[in-house]
Regions:
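Short aromatic-enriched loop/helix-cap "lid" or pocket-rim segments at secondary-structure transitions
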Residues: 58-61, 151-154, 203-204, 235-239
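Hydrophobic positions on the alpha1 helix immediately C-terminal to the Walker A/P-loop
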Residues: 30
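C-terminal lobe/tail of nucleotide-utilizing enzymes
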Residues: 1-10, 181-307
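Short, hinge-like loop/turn segments at secondary-structure boundaries
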Residues: 63-67, 157-159, 241-243
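Conserved catalytic-core segment of NTP-binding enzymes
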Residues: 41, 121-224
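Active-site signature of alpha/beta-hydrolase-fold catalytic machinery across serine-
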Residues: 33, 37, 130
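Short, flexible/disordered intra-domain loops and linkers
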Residues: 88-97, 150, 199-205, 253
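P-loop/Walker-type NTP enzyme "switch/lid" segment
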Residues: 15, 19-25, 37-116, 122, ...
């Protein structure tokens, strides 16, 4: 599911940031699917929610924890932190408080976890920019329309050719440049097309062509994400993902073809992200899977006698 590459030698966690200045693009849904996929691969995962107001990522994880408790299922859960909104009358004091919380959260996990998955608010803010500057992998989900394309660039209304970059795209380019100057690291920027129509259309092709043209100008990779499916909306109240067991006990309903197709989409997305896994994590995942296999089997005579 996830591509294995060499981990860096710094000993720091690989930081995956979900970023888009427009809300409703599927950042939180994509973030949890990435986190759960990494956990299932045996990686140690911490998550941070910087969307102090909406907290969709936090609610998604809390829903998952509550559903696991209610059903007795062993659902993988990351170590999670939600940054609290500053509540003073002074903007500077609020930003200082939120910054300190964020730094404390990162410091607590960066040396002992393999990955940190960060969800950012759908608006420009100091914390959002800071998270982007820390990203090893930046994932920008957009809905498959020119309304959402506008967060990255502008197009000619007659020819649909790209005419310029947006404020957000310029911010990302600036933070990536500063990151390279600071420590020589390069941020892998991936734009994920979400809510894809399952039918071909002229608009769908025009958006794809626009992203291809813009990718050369901005240096990102464009990949297909999630189609417009009811199952993704149904996952949220129970905190589930398309990677969890597709059975009635887990889903709380009978699985459908939509669940199977959604899993295929998510698996394809995660493979294309090319996130780095270490071999220790792969062994942890294999040992965990073997343990669950043995738990489901009755004890053999030689197990009882210790032979």
């Amino acid at each position: 599911m996830l591509m294995q590459t060499s981990q860096g030698q710094s000993g720091s966690a690989h930081v995956v940031v979900m970023g888009n200045e427009k809300g409703g693009s599927g950042k939180s849904t994509t973030a949890l699917h990435i986190a759960v996929a990494l956990l299932k691969a045996g990686q140690r995962v911490a998550t941070i929610d910087l969307d102090c107001r909406q907290q969709s990522f936090t609610r998604y994880i809390n829903n998952r924890r509550a559903w696991a408790r209610r059903t007795g299922l062993d659902l993988e859960l990351p170590v999670h932190c939600c940054i609290k909104l500053g509540e003073t009358m002074q903007i500077a004091d609020n930003e200082s408080s939120e910054f300190q919380q964020f730094m404390d959260a990162v410091s607590a996990v960066e040396r002992t976890f393999d990955f940190i998955v960060i969800d950012t608010p759908g608006s420009d803010s100091y914390l959002m920019r800071l998270a982007h500057s820390m990203a090893d992998t930046l994932v920008t989900p957009i809905n498959d329309s020119f309304l959402d394309f506008d967060v990255l660039g502008t197009v000619d209304p007659a020819t649909y050719s790209v005419t310029g970059e947006s404020h957000y795209a310029e911010m990302v380019r600036d933070t990536r440049r500063k990151r390279r100057q600071l420590d020589g690291a390069s941020t892998d920027w991936i734009v994920v097309r979400n809510r894809l129509s399952m039918l071909g259309s002229r608009n769908k092709q025009l958006v794809a062509d626009g992203l291809k043209e813009l990718s050369f100008r901005l240096g990102f990779r464009s990949i297909d994400g999630f189609a417009e499916r009811v199952v993704y909306r149904e996952f949220f109240p129970r905190g589930l993902t398309a990677l969890d067991d597709l059975d009635e006990a887990t889903l709380g309903t009978r699985p459908s073809l939509g669940h199977v197709t959604a899993r295929e989409e998510v698996t394809s997305l995660l493979r294309q992200l090319k996130l780095p896994l270490d071999e220790r994590g792969r062994r942890r995942a294999a040992n965990r899977a073997e343990w669950f296999t043995q738990v489901d089997k009755p004890l053999e005579v030689h197990d009882i006698l210790g032979a």
